[in-house]
Structure formats: C-alpha cells, structure tokens
A protein has these predicted regions:
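Conserved HGGG/HGGXW glycine-rich cap/lid loop of the alpha/beta-hydrolase fold
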Residues: 17-68
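Conserved hydrolase catalytic core segment
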Residues: 94-137
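Catalytic histidine-centered segment of alpha/beta-hydrolase-like enzymes
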Residues: 264-276
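Conserved loop-alpha-helix segment in the C-terminal half of the alpha/beta-hydrolase fold
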Residues: 223-267
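Alpha/beta-hydrolase fold catalytic core
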Residues: 1-29, 50-54, 92-94, 129, ...
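Active-site loop/oxyanion-hole signature of alpha/beta-hydrolase fold enzymes
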Residues: 9-14, 56-99, 281
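A catalytic-pocket lid/entrance helix-loop region that shapes and gates access to the active site
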Residues: 125-158
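Conserved alpha/beta-hydrolase catalytic His-Asp/Glu region
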Residues: 153-214
Length: 289
C-alpha cells in the first residue's frame, strides 16, 4: 500500500483536506471522487500505478476530512470553484492531469471546458452527466427541495466498521473483505457512543432544486481542449438508471473533440475498486501517449 499524507488548505472559507501520495518532481495527477465518497477511495488505483506520479485527491466540501459547507444544502457550481482555487494552490498556472469518478468526472469535464488551459489531459470514469430534464419538472423539483430542507436527512448508524464493510460488500460483491474494511474505515467515523456513521454531511442527500440543463453542460464539454479518456464499466447500470439509452450515451461522448473511449470488463460503476489494475493500465497508457 502506497502511503498517503494529509494536507489542509483554506479554500473559499473552508478547511479543505487533500490527500497526497507524494512523488516530488513527478507529473501531477489530481483525482476527484464521487458523491458520498472520499479521497481514500482511490487508494487501490494509486497502488496499481506503475509510473511515478505526484498524486493529489481532495475530499470535496462536506465529505471526509474537509469541513462541511455553511449552507443547509450543496450546490454543484461550488465544486467547480473549489477545484479552481485548489489547482491554483497546487500548481499555480500549470496544467495538470485531471481524473474524476462519477460526480468528480462531471466536475472535471465541466471545469476542463471552462478553464481549458488548466487541464493537460482529462480522464472521466463513469461521469456522464444526469438525466435530461424538462422545464415542466421545475415546480415538483422545487417542492421536493423545500420538503427535504424541512425534513433534514440523516445517516443510519452502524454498530461497527465491520457492519459498514458488510454493507459495502453487499452493494458491490466484487469488493474483497480487505478492501471493504479499508473503505469502511475511511468512509465512516466512530462516535462517542461507539456507533459508526458515514463521514460526511447528510445535507448532500438533499435534491438540487435547479434542474440539470444538458444543453449548458454540452456547451462546456465542447470547449474542452485536452485529450479525453472516457472509461466505463462493462457491468455498470448507472447510465441506464438515468434513463439514457445507448444512442444518448454515444451522443454525450461525441461532444468531446479529442476523445478515446474504453470499457473495463468485469467492472461496474465503482470500476476503480473492481478493476484498479486495468483502470491504471488504461490511464497510464493514455497519459504517456
């Protein structure tokens, strides 16, 4: 296991945790985790890299060891702004290799279109956007948001890290017991009563009242100048759950001018857990090209 370090930055008024697997002087890679995840989730991928990389991975606001947001809900544009400030702290004006999974992939793809000069190469792991929406959906969405703000979501407690690890294995049977235990101890924290809860702000569960506007997202994607590697898991059901068919999925990939597409066998949405060696091989081949 490659050892990581914890660093903290003041980012837009929040104490931000950034995990670093150091290799001073090597090319920088920045890894962006998904919804309800943490930076340590990339440990297996980092362990599988063969080349020397200086790797950084933030915990997004309200996740892991980063401070919770000061509002009662979270907004997608904040991730883009947080990333911009963080990259300035890590690399000043230099371009970096950006790798994002799921939510992190969506942030990375948007950012690479808004700040194309900051991204040398872009790897998107299962971050293909959200379901398209219609303006007529707005009243119901706002009503749901107001209801969830009043109800204030929470996380269920677990009796132990072992119980949380068991839940992770039920959700993803490909996880080995060792990997599930590792993830549980980074995803969870133990309270004074001994119960384990997820290490994050439950407000992340509150729906975004602003509809997903694919036309705006697509306009950003089309401005990406960096080469893009788009990797999905052969057994992933994520885009089907969003109601996207194969033609819509292909149309989204086609928005990137310089895209290479790869599919990882025997892997689902959490492909960096299921097949980290193959994902690392694809990434390093792409970055070296």
């Amino acid at each position: 296991v490659r050892a990581s370090e914890s660093h903290f930055f003041e980012i837009r008024g929040l104490r931000y945790h950034v995990r670093r697997w150091p290799a001073p002087g090597a090319p920088k890679i920045v890894l962006l985790h998904g919804w309800m995840d943490v930076s340590a989730s990339f440990q297996f991928l980092v362990d599988a890299f063969n080349a020397r990389w200086d790797v950084y991975a933030p915990d997004w606001r309200g996740y892991g060891l980063t401070a919770w947001g000061r509002s009662d809900c979270y907004w997608f544009p904040d991730y883009i702004a947080d990333l911009d400030f963080l990259l300035r702290a890590l690399a000043e004006d230099a371009g970096v290799h950006l790798i994002g999974h799921s939510l992190g992939g969506n942030v990375a793809c948007m950012y690479a279109g808004v700040r194309p000069e900051r991204v040398a190469k872009l790897v998107n792991l299962e971050g293909f956007g959200l379901a398209t929406t219609k303006p007529e959906d707005a009243p119901r969405r706002y009503a749901r948001w107001l209801r969830e703000l009043q109800e204030r979501p929470g996380f269920r407690p677990y009796a132990s890290f072992a119980e949380l690890a068991g839940r992770l294995r039920r959700e993803n049977p490909r996880l080995t017991p060792e990997r599930a235990d590792f993830l549980a101890r980074h995803w969870g924290r133990q309270g004074e009563d001994g119960a384990v809860v997820l290490r994050g702000d439950p407000a992340h569960k509150i729906v975004n009242p602003v509809l997903y506007r694919y036309e705006e997202v697509r306009a950003c994607w089309r401005q990406v100048k960096a080469p893009v590697l788009w990797i999905d898991g052969a057994d992933s059901k994520a885009f089907a759950r969003l109601g996207l068919d194969a033609a819509e999925y292909a149309e989204r990939r086609a928005q990137f001018p310089r895209l290479r597409h790869a599919t990882v066998a025997n892997a689902g949405h959490m492909l960096h857990h299921d097949a980290p060696e193959e994902v690392a091989r694809l990434i390093e081949g792409f970055l070296a090209a």
